[in-house]
């Protein structure tokens, strides 16, 4: 044991920072490594926190800080320190920085510190235990919402621009009435998992799908669903919209939305009429889009199936050998399926990304016009003026379809400068949609396929 006052410990980090922590909820546990880089052993007389209000410390299994005394670390050895944050409800709605210092006093007289910091955020908690059913509900932008289990809205559901809805593991939202979710490009509605920390240093938990269940719009009556600029991220099912109606069917409109990174389906349309515009539906382990029963028009929509296309294993499931889009027109009891894609992109890393399951191709009522398609089966009379992927193609469709975690480069389904989807859209189709999902103009230009107009 050395009492040389020049010897000191080394730490895996000088400042341990937590992402936003919901008040009264607690954080995930972070790890701090304490090293003795010296040849001789060092003794830690005492470990303590300056304040001790928000942070909880565990050293090699000991959680009582009064007993964190006379700890020895041999030369070249290390020990684990585990730290959590528990922040009491705040007096205001804005995030508040909470900080503390973790002190290590050595027997040689030297004291070292590690800074601890986290942002606390008040949150509205819903369905703390089991299922909660309400007759109507409005999600505002004042505070984030945390859904802990199954939240059922039996009547009208409203989501205001800028609303943030965080879903705990296995949590889901059921809407059985009309839905009016009006986000904007500047203030989108965000629905995502409640893990705000990181899976690895370079990988946020948001990048791992399956962290919550899904959104379900279900009814036995012809409801109206209006969604604008709603981002639904990293669940099991992005958006399931279905009914038992035969006629008239519920009406769904989606504009400027993003459904991304789900371990099952992205968008499921069953017995519903839908208009989907300027929307990205991407990276789902099963179908990105599944349609069965109803009239569905997709215009300037990007469907990109690159789930798990990376060199790091962060997903709990593997990509199924399914197409990005599956259109089911085989049922003898459901309403006829009439699904059309215009000025869209449907692609992925598997060979065939579009399946139209119908008894007779020539009688299928849907159309495909002005699209970029990766498919080896869709050569129907109603598919015209499309550009098809070829095995000899060497140019990239998107800015980035491969997650490069070491470089912190995530998927980006905007168009590459040489993308074959540039300038292939139908101008008449594009007229009612003069701007893309990012707000860039298509007016006076030959429109690109997909929800993003290429910006030189």
Where is each model-derived feature located?
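Short, solvent-exposed loop/linker segments at beta-strand-coil boundaries, enriched for Pro/Gly
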Residues: 48-67
């Amino acid at each position: 044991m050395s009492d040389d006052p020049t010897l000191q410990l080394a730490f895996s980090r000088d400042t341990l920072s937590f992402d936003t922590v919901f008040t009264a909820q607690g954080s995930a546990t972070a790890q701090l490594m304490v090293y003795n880089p010296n040849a001789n052993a060092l003794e830690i007389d005492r470990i303590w926190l300056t304040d001790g209000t928000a942070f909880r410390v565990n050293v090699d299994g000991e959680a009582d800080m009064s007993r964190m005394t006379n700890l020895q670390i041999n030369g070249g050895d290390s020990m684990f320190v585990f730290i959590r944050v528990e922040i009491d409800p705040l007096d205001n709605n804005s995030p508040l920085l909470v900080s503390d210092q973790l002190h290590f006093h050595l027997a040689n007289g030297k004291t070292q510190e590690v800074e601890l910091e986290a942002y606390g955020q008040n949150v509205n908690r819903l369905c703390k235990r089991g299922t909660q059913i309400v007759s109507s509900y409005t999600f505002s932008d004042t505070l984030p919402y945390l859904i802990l289990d199954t939240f059922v809205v039996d009547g009208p559901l409203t989501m205001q621009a800028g609303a943030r809805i965080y879903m705990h593991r296995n949590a889901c939202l059921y809407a059985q009435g009309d839905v009016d979710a009006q986000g904007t490009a500047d203030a989108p509605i965000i629905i995502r998992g409640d893990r705000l920390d990181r899976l690895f240093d370079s990988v946020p938990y948001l990048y791992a799908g399956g962290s919550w269940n899904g959104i379900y719009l279900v009814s036995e009556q012809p409801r109206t669903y209006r969604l604008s600029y709603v981002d639904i991220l990293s669940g099991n099912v992005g958006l399931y919209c279905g009914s038992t109606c035969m006629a008239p069917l519920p009406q769904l409109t989606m504009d400027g939305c993003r459904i991304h990174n789900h371990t099952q389906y992205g968008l499921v349309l069953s017995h519903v009429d839908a208009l989907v515009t300027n929307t990205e539906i991407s990276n789902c382990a099963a179908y990105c889009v599944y349609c069965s029963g109803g009239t569905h028009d997709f215009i300037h929509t990007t469907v990109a199936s690159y789930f798990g296309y990376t060199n790091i294993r962060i997903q709990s499931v593997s990509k199924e050998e399914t197409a990005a889009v599956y259109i089911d027109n085989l049922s003898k009891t459901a309403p006829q399926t009439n699904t059309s894609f215009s000025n869209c992109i449907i692609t992925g890393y598997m060979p065939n990304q579009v399946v139209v399951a119908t008894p007779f191709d020539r009688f299928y009522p849907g159309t495909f016009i002005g699209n970029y398609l990766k498919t080896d089966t869709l050569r129907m009379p109603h598919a015209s003026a499309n550009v098809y992927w070829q095995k000899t193609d060497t140019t990239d469709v998107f800015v980035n379809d491969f997650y490069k975690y070491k470089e912190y480069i995530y998927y980006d389904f905007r168009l590459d400068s040489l993308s074959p989807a540039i300038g292939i859209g139908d101008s008449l189709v594009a007229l009612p949609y003069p701007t893309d999902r990012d707000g860039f103009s298509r007016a006076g230009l030959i429109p690109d396929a997909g929800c993003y107009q290429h910006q030189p």
